[in-house]
Amino acid sequence: MGRGKIEIKRIENSSNRQVTYSKRRNGILKKAKEISVLCDARVSVIIFASSGKMHEFSSTSLVDILDQYHKLTGRRLWDAKHENLDNEINKVKKDNDNMQIELRHLKGEDITSLNHRELMMLEDALDNGLTSIRNKQNDLLRMMRKKTQSMEEEQDQLNWQLRQLEIASMNRNMGEIGEVFHQRENEYQTQMPFAFRVQPMQPNLQERF
């Protein structure tokens, strides 16, 4: 029983599509190698998967094959791309040259060729630049003053806290000294003979003895 004809259309199932791609890709690359060997042909095959991954085979240098293709067909594959790239490069060069000229004018160089209107525009540009510089300078000064004020306030707060700690330490030391003094006084009075502890306000007590 012969094989049925396979309908050529996109395989919807992604797994089946990947399996079919791998098999047929390997088959194409194998055939390309075979024909290059059997027939001494110059073959180049490039395959891009839907994922963007590339597979290739080239019997000789791909650059040599492309050069031969250009010579035989008279067409270059990247003429349009190169033309767009050249245009972009020329535009960048022109913009750079104009910027260099404007920079020299802003420095006061090469201004003899400028007409009155161009000189007025240059003056406006310089005035605007000077205004921007002054505004930026004022902003920086305000920021520096604000930062200095904040640092001074923080320093004052730290000094106040330090004074409070010193006062608390001094009070604590004075309290400890007072406690030691009272303790020593009590011990001294306890050890003193009774006769020496009689108050001078009552001299008659000694006469009674």
UniProtKB/Swiss-Prot annotation:
Subcellular locations according to the entry: Nucleus
Annotated protein name in UniProt: Floral homeotic protein GLOBOSA
Chief localisation class: nucleus
One Pfam family of this chain: K-box
Species of provenance: Nicotiana tabacum
Tissues in which the protein is found: Expressed mainly in floral organs and, within the flower, expression is restricted to petals and stamens.
Listed GO biological process terms: positive regulation of transcription by RNA polymerase II; regulation of transcription by RNA polymerase II
UniProt GO cellular component terms: nucleus
UniProt xrefs under InterPro entries: MADS-box/MEF2_TF, MEF2-like_N, TF_Kbox, TF_MADSbox, TF_MADSbox_sf
Annotated K-box domain residues: 82-173
Record GO terms (molecular function): DNA-binding transcription factor activity, RNA polymerase II-specific; protein dimerization activity; RNA polymerase II cis-regulatory region sequence-specific DNA binding
Keyword terms of this UniProt record: Activator, Developmental protein, DNA-binding, Nucleus, Transcription, Transcription regulation
Start and end residues of each MADS-box domain: 3-57
Classification via PANTHER family: SERUM RESPONSE FACTOR HOMOLOG
Described function: Transcription factor involved in the genetic control of flower development. Acts in conjunction with DEFICIENS (defA).
Note in the entry: Mutations in Glo cause transformation of petals into sepals and stamina into carpels.
